[in-house]
Amino acid sequence: MEVMQLSFSYPALFLFVFFLFMLVKQLRRPKNLPPGPNKLPIIGNLHQLATELPHHTLKQLADKYGPIMHLQFGEVSAIIVSSAKLAKVFLGNHGLAVADRPKTMVATIMLYNSSGVTFAPYGDYWKHLRQVYAVELLSPKSVRSFSMIMDEEISLMLKRIQSNAAGQPLKVHDEMMTYLFATLCRTSIGSVCKGRDLLIDTAKDISAISAAIRIEELFPSLKILPYITGLHRQLGKLSKRLDGILEDIIAQREKMQESSTGDNDERDILGVLLKLKRSNSNDTKVRIRNDDIKAIVFELILAGTLSTAATVEWCLSELKKNPGAMKKAQDEVRQVMKGETICTNDVQKLEYIRMVIKETFRMHPPAPLLFPRECREPIQVEGYTIPEKSWLIVNYWAVGRDPELWNDPEKFEPERFRNSPVDMSGNHYELIPFGAGRRICPGISFAATNAELLLASLIYHFDWKLPAGVKELDMDELFGAGCVRKNPLHLIPKTVVPCQD
């Protein structure tokens, strides 16, 4: 008698069950979602996000479907907002409802279970951390206290450029990153840091991983996926390296504190955080642990370098493309400084430089798609139901190119901000490169001061020309952790105002 053989495939069964799971989720979606393009089975609209410049693609879709859209990215239900008006509705009027962040593997592993202020879940710990940032870490007084470090490091950068100013093209981004990493390391963990170079290399490796849109984050129910793609192993390896560096830094500082009788060790961010840790008591509602300190310090270094370097590189690019604006900027800083060394305190006198920075943030925001928020509860907006757990993504790049907000939005025109009340504090939703509402970046003042000092110093001391054979500067973008130049900016510096010792 023949025995019937049953052909059984575990992968096929897995795919079938997963398909049913996704189908049930789609059937349970509210019927009055915002409009959007058709969704494919399982992947939804992922194929429309898989482009070199997703912020451009999303703007094109918004032109067709409107300033509020619903897209499906794998398992993630996403609401895309492309207007200043609706950004204010969500981030302002419904700020509490969208105060959370999606839980991501990169933030969980690399930032000690999302213990930094950017990705920490909304709650008592996050509120306490925001207060620490506002009062202790990045208050205006704290930023002013960093001015000596910034001035010293900018002087070192300018001298390096001046010593190499022999007609050879310079990769401007690298010089700015050297300045920013040095400044952020000194303000965060002190001037003497064993392992600082390794920390910098680790930060670069992590930013490279987080630059891409991770498919693993869009299918959270597929727990095995990060192991298949190798992401979990890669993050684990980097996390182990990072933790060893930061543990050594903290141990070294605590040892110094034990033998110190003064408070010099509390003048940088690490010193302040360790002081807060020592003040923990049984009555303290939220305690600062070593892992929290490591997450905060590393997040500050990572966030404070990449975006500022990208912004100033775009500033120089636009000024080279627009020689009239370059002349105005250089004339201003050279007339104000009159041959003297430029310092952090001097940037407040440079109105046109600030206008250039604002215009660059409008046209080339470091985060064209603001970090996603996650809805903590269902909300009603414009007659649509926004489901709980939906991601809210503001396409700020589209807001910056909105012809209803900006006259001739494709034109680089810093003068549009002359005598304008619009600033980047989060109150004017047409200009929110640092976000808005409860989750606005707490480092606005520090980042803006660094950008202004960098740009003013570079165009004050040097004239810049294109390398031989380059007739026109390209402005192609590369989307990743931020929006940077696809081809790094190479310029030849010519010393005009020599750097003084």
Swiss-Prot record:
| Enzyme class, spelled out | oxidoreductase
The coenzyme or cofactor needed here is: heme
Its membrane topology: Single-pass type II membrane protein
Gene Ontology CC terms, in alphabetical order: endoplasmic reticulum membrane
What is it used for? The strictosidine aglycone-producing AJM7-DeltaHYS yeast strain expressing pathway genes of the VOM module, RsGS, SBE (GsSBE, RsSBE1 or RsSBE2), RsPNAE, RsVS and RsVH, accumulates vomilenine. Additionnal expression of pathway genes of the AJM module, RsVR, RsDHVR, AAE (RsAAE1 or RsAAE2) and RsNNMT, leads to the production of ajmaline. Ajmaline is an anti-arrhythmic alkaloid commercially used as an efficient drug for the treatment of arrhythmic heart disorder.
Location in or out of the cell: Endoplasmic reticulum membrane
Reaction equation(s) it catalyzes = (19E)-geissoschizine + reduced [NADPH--hemoprotein reductase] + O2 = polyneuridine aldehyde + oxidized [NADPH--hemoprotein reductase] + 2 H2O + H(+); tetrahydroalstonine + A + reduced [NADPH--hemoprotein reductase] + O2 = alstonine + AH2 + oxidized [NADPH--hemoprotein reductase] + 2 H2O + H(+); ajmalicine + A + reduced [NADPH--hemoprotein reductase] + O2 = serpentine + AH2 + oxidized [NADPH--hemoprotein reductase] + 2 H2O + H(+)
Which GO terms of the molecular function aspect are on file? Answer: heme binding; iron ion binding; monooxygenase activity; oxidoreductase activity, acting on paired donors, with incorporation or reduction of molecular oxygen
Hey, what tissues is this thing expressed in?
A: Highly expressed in roots. Expressed at low levels in stems.
The regions listed as transmembrane in this protein's record are 3-23
Q: What is its EC number?
A: 1.14.19.81
Question: Of which family is this protein a member?
Answer: Belongs to the cytochrome P450 family.
Q: What PANTHER family does the database record attribute to this sequence?
A: CYTOCHROME P450, CYTOCHROME P450 FAMILY 71 PROTEIN
The protein's name in its UniProt record: Sarpagan bridge enzyme
Q: Which organism is it from?
A: Gelsemium sempervirens
Q: What lineage is this protein's organism placed in? A: Eukaryota, Viridiplantae, Streptophyta, Embryophyta, Tracheophyta
Q: Which gene encodes it?
A: SBE
